[in-house]
């Protein structure tokens, strides 16, 4: 082969990243680089000593992978950003007994080679979507803090500690209110975001906050090729078990996906399945599952998946929700 394809595993951290290139003979070449623009350029110089065609694989690690993934994409290198759970399962099947950054980089290169036809191809999100995603994550963090402080308040007896915690609760509430206002301004300042939020809000069970969460992760509808891919990304696809006489038994959902989407959709799905909005457009869908003897949690999860697939279709088609089109 004149121009062989090299699989590259990248184990990335805050300050540096380990890179392992899998050679044609199955061995690996390893090197460490700084996680900054200078390190990215040095990486490119090193990769060019092997060839011209690469497929780089890295795990989604907070925000540490984003700059490098964007840089490699700009260099026209194929990049895959995978869920850490996928590589963790691969590590177990590969019987790796040690765990170091170097070993992890080699493992990711092997993972890329073995799963070459199933790897998701990385597409950078727009600056507006990235800003929305980061603000939304901060909002989720503040809400968790607020819940924790409220729980602590019920366990305190010292008056000074109670007063301190109450002040903290007031402060966090103010921060949440200010950030929610900023998120609305962020949406209104971008015509694409504004239009997509408006479209998603036409879906029963989807309000502004849920629409923002969905757009922050799903994008404008072009990130995934179809609704099934979006549901897979959200970790809402069925997990099938096939062993012995138990063939193709559904044992739950995969949960290998974006948990923020599942959290955002749980309450809306619960309310529209069994709560105050149970006589909604989803009633026939829910009744059909009840008649099949499905438990409540299974039905709620199924409706969550339904909402994701509808949201993806609405964004992809750039069409408002229509009962005849989206509930066939």
Question: What are the functions of these language-model segments?
Answer:
Residues 53-64:
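Short glycine-rich phosphate-binding loop at a beta-alpha junction
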Residues 38-55:
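Short, basic/hydrophobic alpha-helical segments
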Residues 2-22, 108:
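Gly/Thr-rich phosphate-binding beta-strand-loop-beta motif of the actin/hexokinase/Hsp70
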Residues 14, 62, 86, 216:
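Short, glycine/acidic-enriched loop or turn micro-motifs at the edges of active sites
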Residues 80-199:
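Long, charge-rich intrinsically disordered scaffolds of nucleic-acid metabolism proteins
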Residues 13-38:
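Short glycine-rich, Thr/Ser-proximal phosphate-binding strand/loop in the N-terminal lobe
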Residues 208, 214-292, 296, 328:
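Phosphate-backbone recognition surface of nucleic-acid-processing proteins
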Residues 291-328:
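Basic, amphipathic alpha-helical segments enriched in Lys/Arg and hydrophobic/aromatic residues
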